[in-house]
Amino acid sequence: MKQTIILLYGGRSAEREVSVLSAESVMRAVNYDRFTVKTFFISQSGDFIKTQEFSHAPGQEDRLMTNETIDWDKKVAPSAIYEEGAVVFPVLHGPMGEDGSVQGFLEVLKMPYVGCNILSSSLAMDKITTKRVLESAGIAQVPYVAIVEGDDVTAKIAEVEEKLAYPVFTKPSNMGSSVGISKSENQEELRQALKLAFRYDSRVLVEQGVNAREIEVGLLGNYDVKSTLPGEVVKDVAFYDYDAKYIDNKITMDIPAKISDDVVAVMRQNAETAFRAIGGLGLSRCDFFYTDKGEIFLNELNTMPGFTQWSMYPLLWDNMGISYPELIERLVDLAKESFDKREAHLI
C-alpha cells in the first residue's frame, strides 16, 4: 500500500508565492511508485482548501490552486487534513508556516510531519532570538542592534550609529526570504528602512553590513544531522532580496563554492552545531557570510528553505549524490522517525 503525503502549501505570510512554487516542484518529483500525494491549500485568509490528489505523476498542464484560482466549495476544516498513517509535508515559508504554529497544530492531530518541531521552528523563525541562542553556542555573527516596537526610535538609531557603521541592513525579526529587508547608507535611509521592516513585524534587527560572499550549507537528519559541501550565491544585484531570489532571476549558484577546505570544514561544523543548538529536525539551510578578511559569520538558519527543484537546498544535496526525489523520500522517513520518538516520550 502506498504511503500518503499530505502537501500543505500557500499560507498567510508574504512568502506564499514561494510556497506554491516549492509545492508544485515536490508534487512533480515524488516517487509515485511509493507515494500518493494529497494537497491542501491554505489561503491568505487562513482557510484550508482541499485541492488535488495525485496517485501518479501529474501532467505538465496540472497546476496547484492559488489565491487567484480558489474553489471555495472545497473549503474544509483544518482537521480535515488528518489521515491515519499519512505524513504531512508543510511546504510553508515564513510566519504561520515555519514558525511553530502549523507544527503545533500537526502535533495536536498526532500526524508525522517533515521538518523542525515547534521549538526549533519558532526559535529559528525569530532572527533576534536565534542570534542570542547561537551566541551562547559560541558561533560568530555580525554585530547587531535589536529594536522592538515601542522603543524610542531616535535613541535606537543613536545606538546603531554608536555600535555599527553604515551601511547597515534592517530586517523584520520574524520573516524569511529576504522580505522587508533594506540596505541603508545613512540615517534617513535607516529611518525609512525601519518603517518598512515594522510593516512586517514588531521586532526588527539592524545588522552591520559586511563585504562578504554568501555561502550556504544544507543540513539533513535528526539527531544524526549531516551537512553538505557549501554552495555560493552569486548576485547581480546589490543584495539578495525577495525579488532577486524569486522574481527577477538575478542570482546564480556556484555549487560547490570555490573556498578552501579549511573554510569548508568550519562552515560545516558551525552549521551542524547551530542545528543542534536550536534542536533542529529534518532539514535546514544554514547561511554564512565569508568576508574578504577571511571572517566567517553565520547569518541565519532557515528551517524550511526554498524547495523548488532549482532552489539552493535541493541542489546542494544533489551535489552530494542525493537526487531531488530521493531527498523527498529521506525527509518523509525522517519525519516518521521523529514522530515515533516524540510519541514514545509521552509516557
Curated annotation (Swiss-Prot):
It is found in: Cytoplasm. One of its GO terms (biological process) is regulation of cell shape. It is an enzyme of class 6 (ligase). Mg(2+) 2 binds at residues 300, 302. Pathway: Cell wall biogenesis; peptidoglycan biosynthesis. Mg(2+) 1 binds at residues 287, 300. Its EC number is 6.3.2.4. It catalyses: 2 D-alanine + ATP = D-alanyl-D-alanine + ADP + phosphate + H(+). Binds 2 magnesium or manganese ions per subunit. One of its GO terms (molecular function) is ATP binding. GO terms for cellular component: cytosol. Cell wall formation. Belongs to the D-alanine--D-alanine ligase family. This is D-alanine--D-alanine ligase.
